[in-house]
């Protein structure tokens, strides 16, 4: 199942191109702010997901919450590893499966993890401006699908 999701992403030049271009735009901005924007969108659009983050304390504090900041930074570096692995399907599978372990330990299912798609779309819109497109959002949904398959 993971192998199929990886093949879909790594086998598509369009998906890889959209991921790389959009990640380049996001990385040229403040990487920490991108992660914090994503988490704020997640908690606004999917308030039910806050229950997965109780160990981080008051997530409403945003940047003032060092645990939340740490999670935002870690998340963006994980995404960076994913994008860097697009030309090596076995490597992408390995880094995604490692990432998935933390979520499996917190009993987050693939379906529950899918709740990040809409907040990711909103983050892309906010951070990319005129560079955003539905194709970009679709590419990120496909990459999220790899993680979902690993869960």
UniProtKB/Swiss-Prot annotation:
Modified-residue entries (N-acetylvaline), positions: 2
Q: Which domain of life, per UniProt?
A: Eukaryota
Q: Name one Pfam family in it.
A: Globin
Which cysteine-cysteine pairs are annotated as disulfide bonds in the entry?
Answer: none
Cross-referenced SUPFAM superfamilies, in alphabetical order?
A: Globin-like (SSF46458)
Q: Which Gene3D superfamilies match?
A: Globins
Protein name per UniProt: Globin-1 subunit alpha
């Amino acid at each position: 199942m993971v192998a199929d999701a990886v093949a879909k992403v790594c086998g598509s030049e369009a998906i890889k191109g959209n991921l790389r271009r959009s990640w380049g735009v996001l990385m040229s901005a403040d990487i920490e702010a991108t992660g914090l924007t994503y988490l704020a969108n997640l908690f606004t659009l999917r308030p039910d997901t806050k229950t997965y983050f109780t160990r981080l304390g008051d997530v409403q504090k945003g940047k003032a919450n060092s645990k939340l900041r740490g999670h935002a930074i870690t998340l963006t570096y994980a995404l960076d590893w994913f994008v860097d692995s697009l030309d090596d399907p076995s490597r992408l599978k390995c880094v995604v499966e490692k990432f998935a372990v933390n979520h499996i330990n917190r009993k987050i299912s693939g379906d529950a993890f899918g709740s990040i798609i809409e907040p990711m779309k909103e983050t892309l819109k906010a951070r990319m401006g005129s560079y955003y497109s539905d194709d970009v959002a679709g590419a990120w949904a496909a990459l999220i699908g790899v993680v979902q398959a690993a869960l």
